[in-house]
Regions:
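Single conserved hydrophobic/aromatic residue that forms the stacking wall/gate
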Residues: 1-8, 12
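A short, hydrophobic beta-strand/beta-hairpin element that forms part of a small beta-sheet core
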Residues: 13-19
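A basic- and aromatic-enriched beta-loop-alpha substructure that forms the phosphate/nucleotide-
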Residues: 28-40
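Residue-level signal for nonpolar/aromatic packing positions in well-ordered secondary structure
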Residues: 31, 100, 119, 156-162
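Acidic/histidine-enriched, glycine/proline-rich intrinsically disordered or flexible terminal extensions
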Residues: 169-190
C-alpha cells in the first residue's frame, strides 16, 4: 500500500467505539454505509429498499467519479481539445442523466420516497451538473431536458443540512457565508 496516497485520502478513524484499535473506514461509499449503520439514519431497514439503496450507491461509486471527472477533464481542463473523448464522455454523462431522470420520474428519491445515502452520494456531482452549470457545460449537455433530476436536485439542495454542508470549505462568496473548517455544530448559526 502506498502510504503517501493514504495520507491524502478521506477516512474515518472511529475512536468512540470500544474497539481496539480504532475502526478505520475509507472510500466515500464505505464511509456512508458505516455512518448510516452507526447512527441508524438514511439507510432503509426493509431488505428490498436496502438492496435498492446499495445498488444506487454502487452505481454512483462506479460511474460518477470516472465519467464526471473524465468529462470535466476533456471538456474544460485538457490543454488540447479533442472531439472524440469530449463526445464519448458527454454521451455517457447524458446516458446516466437519462437513467436518473427515468428513475426519478416515478420516485421522489433514488429509493422511492425515502432520502438515503444513495441520494447523499449521488447528489453532489449530478446535482451540480443540472443546477450549477459545472464546466460551463449545461447547454452542451442539455441539462434542462432532465426535469426529474432537476426537481430531485432542488429538493435535496433545499434540505437545511445540505445548505449548511455547501458552506463548509467553500472558497468563494462573502466570508460570512462560508465556514472554512468544520469542527463542531456550533460552527453554524442553526
Amino acid at each position: 500500500h502506498n502510504d503517501a496516497r493514504r495520507q491524502r485520502q478521506m477516512c474515518i478513524r472511529d475512536r468512540d467505539r470500544s474497539a481496539t484499535p480504532p475502526i478505520r473506514v475509507f472510500e466515500s461509499g464505505a464511509m456512508l454505509i458505516y455512518l448510516a449503520e452507526k447512527f441508524d439514519a438514511f439507510y432503509p431497514k426493509d431488505a428490498a429498499l436496502r438492496a435498492e439503496c446499495l445498488s444506487w450507491l454502487m452505481w454512483q461509486m462506479g460511474s460518477a467519479p470516472y465519467l464526471g471527472g473524465g468529462f470535466g477533464h476533456f471538456y474544460a481542463y485538457a490543454p488540447e481539445k479533442f472531439e472524440y473523448p469530449i463526445d464519448r464522455f458527454a454521451m455517457e454523462v447524458k446516458r446516466q442523466l437519462d437513467v436518473l431522470d427515468k428513475h426519478l420520474s416515478n420516485n421522489n428519491y433514488l429509493c422511492g420516497n425515502e432520502y438515503t445515502i444513495a441520494d447523499i452520494a449521488t447528489y453532489p456531482w449530478y446535482g451540480a451538473c443540472v443546477l450549477h452549470n459545472i464546466y460551463s457545460a449545461a447547454e452542451f449537455l442539455d441539462v434542462e431536458s432532465y426535469t426529474h433530476v432537476i426537481r430531485w436536485a432542488k429538493e435535496i439542495e433545499a434540505r437545511p443540512a445540505v445548505e449548511r454542508g455547501r458552506r463548509v470549505n467553500r472558497p468563494w462568496g462573502p466570508e460570512e457565508t462560508r465556514v472554512l473548517e468544520r469542527h463542531s455544530a456550533s460552527d453554524f448559526d442553526n
